[in-house]
């Protein structure tokens, strides 16, 4: 059955593991990274840092995940049971700017690692390089060899490579052109180090699916090929799409190739993959009654969790504690003890019951919609009153202050 790992969201990327039997109905089953390393660094909210474009692979009875951290290097973890405990992260190659790593175990026993570079950290980008790994896959043992240069202007911002081998060809699936408006590029060569031919195999075309790229090729047990990729939708995150993939003259064609030029457009409706059986409709969890001893997998903290942020119970509620804000506090951009989940849809309603027990003046609790621009509804203790407020912050990453207005108040003794 297919497994899928991704860097979830902008901040705390614990490597969620999703499982499916048919590539359509997915269940969130685990997190491969209970704590993000280095721990001291990620105890604070770190936007745009940590796990970038992980790849999950199965080899010799074990599941592997490789990813690039643009500030620390390329990491690897592994397990025999993806729903169980994963190994501690191994730093395969230390350095700045290395991102989007994917391994390949070749028939001759050699192990290769392809990755890209983030210009914001390394000063170079739009290139793909391949290094050799040791047999255990735990250490890079050769210098990087550049196999593709997108700085000629035709395929700028090439990144996110996935490496495969089929019919004697090495294939590199890589997005180019930028996250929001790019396209899906495929390279092929008979030699791991090239030279590689290149071809654009999927573009937005006449659809409303912008930037259809950066994903992985999956084969079903019935011989079908499919491509899972994302579409960037701004504040709503990176929405996942599934497109059919066919092979023509040893080139993949992704989506609907209406004019038969070898380059497809993403489909909006299509028949489900044929996997030999039917699976029930499944969606990731959203609602939570907070009546179990484990926090629902849909929830993530804004940074590495500390025990004193809150406690689960069997009693139908989650007990949260207020944290102390630093003297330099401007807004919630770097505050770690926010408990959040991704938007379930573009439009939705959230309902909750909150009991507020304030021990000190200035304590607050409430509901927040968090992002570069954010807004929240807090209840704050202010002297002898509880105040319901609305707070809005624009461009929080630029350390802009919140704009707060009072909506209602009630005397403490009234309660």
Which functions belong to the PLM regions below?
Residues 243, 250-252, 257-415:
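Extracellular glycan-recognition regions
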Residues 58-61, 105-109, 165-168, 219-222:
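Residue-level detector of Asp-centered blade-edge/turn motifs that repeat once per structural unit
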Residues 5, 20, 79-80, 133, ...:
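Conserved Ser/Thr-centered positions that define the repeating blades of beta-propeller domains
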Residues 154-196:
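Loop/turn-rich, solvent-exposed surfaces of beta-rich toroidal or solenoidal domains
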Residues 24-57, 85-105, 132-162, 195-216, ...:
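Surface loop/turn signatures of beta-propeller and other carbohydrate-active proteins
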Residues 13-16, 73-76, 122-130, 180-187, ...:
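Structural motif
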Residues 1-8, 12:
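Single conserved hydrophobic/aromatic residue that forms the stacking wall/gate
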Residues 68-107, 115-117:
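Asp-box/WD-like beta-propeller blade repeats and closely related beta-sheet repeat scaffolds
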């Amino acid at each position: 059955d297919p497994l899928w790992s991704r860097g979830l969201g902008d901040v705390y990327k614990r490597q969620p593991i999703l499982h499916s039997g048919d590539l359509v109905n997915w269940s969130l089953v685990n997190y491969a990274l209970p704590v993000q390393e280095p721990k001291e660094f990620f105890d604070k909210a770190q936007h745009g840092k940590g796990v970038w474009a992980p790849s999950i692979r199965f080899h010799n009875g074990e599941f592997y995940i490789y990813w690039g951290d643009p500030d620390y290097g390329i990491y690897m973890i592994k397990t025999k049971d993806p729903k169980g405990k994963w190994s501690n992260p191994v730093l395969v190659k230390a350095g700045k700017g290395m991102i989007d790593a994917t391994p390949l175990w070749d028939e001759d026993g050699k192990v290769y690692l392809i990755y890209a570079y983030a210009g914001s950290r390394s000063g170079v980008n739009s290139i793909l390089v391949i290094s050799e790994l040791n047999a255990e896959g735990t250490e890079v043992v050769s210098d990087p060899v550049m196999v593709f240069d997108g700085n000629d202007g035709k395929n700028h911002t090439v990144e996110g490579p996935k490496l495969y081998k089929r019919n004697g060809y090495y294939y590199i699936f890589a997005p180019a052109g930028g996250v929001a408006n790019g396209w899906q590029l495929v390279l092929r060569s008979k030699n791991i180090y090239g030279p590689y031919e290149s071809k654009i195999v999927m573009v937005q075309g006449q659809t409303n699916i912008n930037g259809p790229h950066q994903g992985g090729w999956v084969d079903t047990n019935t011989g079908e090929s499919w491509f899972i990729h994302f579409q960037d939708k701004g504040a709503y995150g990176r929405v996942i799409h599934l497109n059919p993939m066919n092979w023509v003259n040893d080139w993949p064609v992704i989506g609907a190739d209406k004019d038969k030029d070898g380059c497809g457009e993403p489909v909006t409706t299509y028949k489900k993959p044929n996997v030999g059986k039917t699976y029930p409709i499944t969606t990731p969890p959203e609602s939570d009654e907070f009546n179990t001893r484990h926090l629902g997998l849909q929830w993530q903290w804004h940074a590495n969790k500390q025990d004193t942020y809150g406690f689960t119970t069997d009693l139908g509620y989650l007990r949260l504690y207020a944290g102390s804000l630093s003297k330099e506090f401007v807004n919630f951009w770097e505050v770690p003890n926010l408990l959040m989940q991704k938007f379930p849809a573009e439009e939705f309603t959230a309902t909750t019951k909150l009991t507020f027990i304030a021990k000190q003046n200035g304590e607050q609790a409430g509901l927040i919609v968090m992002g570069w621009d954010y807004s929240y509804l807090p209840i704050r203790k202010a002297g002898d009153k509880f105040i319901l407020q609305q707070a809005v912050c624009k461009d929080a990453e630029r350390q802009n202050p919140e704009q707060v207005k009072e909506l209602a108040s009630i005397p403490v003794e009234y309660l």
